[in-house]
């Protein structure tokens, strides 16, 4: 087991940052900073549930374990999924477009989303049944497969916080970038602990309604907004995904509120992806999202001042393409996960519209 990061002691109000084990040792444990300790119980400070965990108990994620007043991450280095993906699959459209990403996923989640498409791993906590992977091997695999980045994805990467920090540090030494595909339910302290380690924060804002979060996901909205704003403050590239579910989060007023919040707090150049819901897990009785609903969301985003809205899970639709927000020229044509930069020109390190010269914000 690997000791969790980030904690303060309630009783002594002391910070501890020492390593309990040497790097590469059998237990590979390191001083933690993400939980508070009091009378044998600990308060996990990694995600916004703030679980109070008694000795011998687990947090809501089922993976962070209190052993004699010390919090451990049982899933450190335990991998369920490894894959080489096109980066557009995340989806990320303004971050290293056209490149390959080495994707890693584990088990567990701090949400209980009724519509989860990866529920087989997200609602599983059997980390001991998975294969082990060291940070060094993960980075080696990414380089070996000619990937430009490593993504923590498929399940909630916050539960892999310590593993992600160790991989991210090594990845940067090899010139690789790093990606968090997250539900955003981290504490702001946890986000700031990722500063300089995570390059792209691809966040799901599942609805702009706290009731939805409580009933459908088992969480709250405000912590997601706070962590997303914190990621911006840390200089991370941000792209937002909103999966639109018929009857649950598809009202025009709610979509407008979401777009206005993103535009005001994250910025008008923030890509936002409205994706089509397909019935899954516990919501198989609902229909797929009508195309018209997605197209309306696209228009609402434009009207709210967002310059780069996209549609997802709708193959062949122009809503997945990138257009110049100034002159409307087609800049990047996408066909599934394949893309071609048909209307971009390079001006030094900057991408510009071939027609009007507008600077297009893309991280290469």
Specify the residue positions occupied by each region the protein language model found.
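Auxiliary Fe-S-binding modules of radical SAM enzymes
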Residues: 1-52, 247-364
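Short, cysteine/histidine-rich loop/knuckle motifs that typically chelate Zn2+
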Residues: 46, 60-63, 108-111, 115, ...
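Short, non-ligating residues that shape and space the ligands of small metal-coordination modules
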Residues: 53-57, 70, 115, 122-123, ...
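Conserved Radical SAM active-site core
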Residues: 66-200
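Hydrophobic faces of well-ordered beta-strands that scaffold small-molecule active sites
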Residues: 102, 150, 178-180, 201-203, ...
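Alpha-helical scaffolding segments of alpha/beta enzyme cores, especially the outer helices
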Residues: 137-140, 162-173, 189, 193-196, ...
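Conserved glycine-rich "GG(E/T)P / GGGxP" loop and the immediately following alpha-helix
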Residues: 143-170, 212-225, 242-257, 263
């Amino acid at each position: 087991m690997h000791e969790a990061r980030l904690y303060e002691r309630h009783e002594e109000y002391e910070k501890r940052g020492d390593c309990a084990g040497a790097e590469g040792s059998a237990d590979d444990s390191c001083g933690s900073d993400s939980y508070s300790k009091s009378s044998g119980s600990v308060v996990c400070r990694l995600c916004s549930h703030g679980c109070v965990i008694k000795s011998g108990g687990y947090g809501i994620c089922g993976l962070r374990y209190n052993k004699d007043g010390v919090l451990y991450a049982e899933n450190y280095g335990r991998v369920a999924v490894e894959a080489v993906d096109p980066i557009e699959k995340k989806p990320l459209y303004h971050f290293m477009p056209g490149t390959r990403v080495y994707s890693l996923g584990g088990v567990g989640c701090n949400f209980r989303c009724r519509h989860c498409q990866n529920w087989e791993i997200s609602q599983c906590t059997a980390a001991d049944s998975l294969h082990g992977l060291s940070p060094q091997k993960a980075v080696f695999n990414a380089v070996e497969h000619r990937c430009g980045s490593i993504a923590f994805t498929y399940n909630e990467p916050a539960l892999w916080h310590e593993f992600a920090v160790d991989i991210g540090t090594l990845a940067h030494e090899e010139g690789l970038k790093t990606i968090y595909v997250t539900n955003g339910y981290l504490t702001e302290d946890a986000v700031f602990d990722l500063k300089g380690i995570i390059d792209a924060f691809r966040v799901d804002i599942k609805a702009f309604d706290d009731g939805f979060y409580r009933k459908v996901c088992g969480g709250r909205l405000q912590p997601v907004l706070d962590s997303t704003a914190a990621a911006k403050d840390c200089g991370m590239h941000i792209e937002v995904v909103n999966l639109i579910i018929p009857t649950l989060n598809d009202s025009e007023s709610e979509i407008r509120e979401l777009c206005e919040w993103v535009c005001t707090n994250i910025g008008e150049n923030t890509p936002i992806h409205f994706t089509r819901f397909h019935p899954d897990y516990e919501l198989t009785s609902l229909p797929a999202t009508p195309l018209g609903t997605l197209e309306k969301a696209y228009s609402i985003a434009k009207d709210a001042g967002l310059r780069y809205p996209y549609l997802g899970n709708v193959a062949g639709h122009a809503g997945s393409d990138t257009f110049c927000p100034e002159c409307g020229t087609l800049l990047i044509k996408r066909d599934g996960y394949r893309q071609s930069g048909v209307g971009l020109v390079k001006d030094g390190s900057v991408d510009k519209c071939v027609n009007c010269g507008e600077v297009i914000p893309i991280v290469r």
